[in-house]
Amino acid sequence: MNKKPLAIFLMGPTASGKTDLAIALRQTLPVEVISVDSALIYKGMDIGTAKPSKAELELAPHRLIDILDPSESYSAMNFREDALREMAEITASGRIPLLVGGTMLYYKALLEGLSPLPSADPEIRAEIEAKAEQIGWSGLHRELLAIDPIAGKRINPNDSQRINRALEVFYITGKTMTELTAQQGDSLPYNVLQFAIAPQDRAVLHQRIEQRFYKMMELGFQQEVEKLRARSDLHKDLPSIRCVGYRQMWEYLDGDISLDEAIYKGICATRQLAKRQITWLRGWNSEITWLDSLDPTSSKLKMIEKIAQNSIKL
């Protein structure tokens, strides 16, 4: 039986030092970096996403950044397909894929595969919405309870979006959302070493986030969002503009809040994102080696030692 090739996950909350550590590893190990970040995929969104600088990218080129226009959408399934392709290319060249980022849903999709849920069907969605106008979303929720009791109990009767999706899946496939999500996708054909980096003191992370946000403002974050807002095809409901920081700055430019409020809300939203990322990592089912952001040298050595223990020739 062929031995699975090695892949490395370097996960962690925003502002935890993932990029710096990835660059350090790139100077030592035969690795190629793949970004695992739902914001870095967008072109023209450099400052607010803390995208690696030109100098950093010269030291450690990142795959899967700047691959989409902000008007486009991107799913976990899209990421899995793209990442697997990039990983295969890297492995074929005799190097090791190093996947770096904080979008935990992408890691989960890559590691475990995806349930075979169908793509959205605009016609069926329109039919469901027309029916909702007749009997209300509460009526459709009762219909969902009859079709898929488990999903119906989990979904709030006022959550029209999720009710619509659950019914849409059933109308398209003839199977319930519960049935389909129980079907696991293909697992990742790699021997994966998983690392997570974060400061042991949460207050340090909060301080880093605040400092980084003010630094982004100095670098021209407001002007970056102004440029995006000047485009007629972009609006605040797009996934790209819903990224933390961008949404709050957009609200300021719309005149809904003051600049100070936008900065404060942006910092708070980023801290909340970091909290969700850490919570997800704490509940991660797979084995993770934790690294301390405040000791990057030790973190690098710890990763190298772990890789060596797995009989990988460096």
Curated annotation (Swiss-Prot):
> Does the record carry Signal as a key word?
no
User: A Gene Ontology biological process annotation?
Assistant: tRNA modification
What general EC class does the enzyme of this chain belong to? transferase
Amino-acid positions noted as binding substrate in the UniProt annotation, renumbered to this chain: 14-19
- Site description Interaction with substrate tRNA, residues in chain: 103, 125
Q: Which UniProt keywords apply?
A: ATP-binding, Magnesium, Nucleotide-binding, Transferase, tRNA processing
Q: Which annotated residues bind ATP?
A: 12-19
Q: Which reaction does it catalyse?
A: adenosine(37) in tRNA + dimethylallyl diphosphate = N(6)-dimethylallyladenosine(37) in tRNA + diphosphate
Q: Does the keyword Magnesium apply?
A: yes
Which EC numbers characterise this protein's activity in its record?
A: 2.5.1.75
Q: Which residues form a coiled coil?
A: none
| Cofactors (names) | Mg(2+)
What is one Pfam family matched by this protein?
IPPT
| Gene3D superfamilies, sorted | 1.10.20.140, P-loop containing nucleotide triphosphate hydrolases (3.40.50.300)
**Molecular function GO labels:** ATP binding; tRNA dimethylallyltransferase activity
The family database entries (NCBIfam families) matched by this protein are listed as: miaA
The protein's matches in HAMAP family, at most eight in alphabetical order, are given as: IPP_trans
What do we know about how this protein assembles, alone or with others?
Answer: Monomer.
| Function field | Catalyzes the transfer of a dimethylallyl group onto the adenine at position 37 in tRNAs that read codons beginning with uridine, leading to the formation of N6-(dimethylallyl)adenosine (i(6)A).
User: Which protein is depicted?
Assistant: tRNA dimethylallyltransferase
Q: Could you read off the lineage of the organism from its UniProt record?
A: Bacteria, Pseudomonadati, Pseudomonadota, Gammaproteobacteria, Pasteurellales
Q: Which gene encodes it?
A: miaA
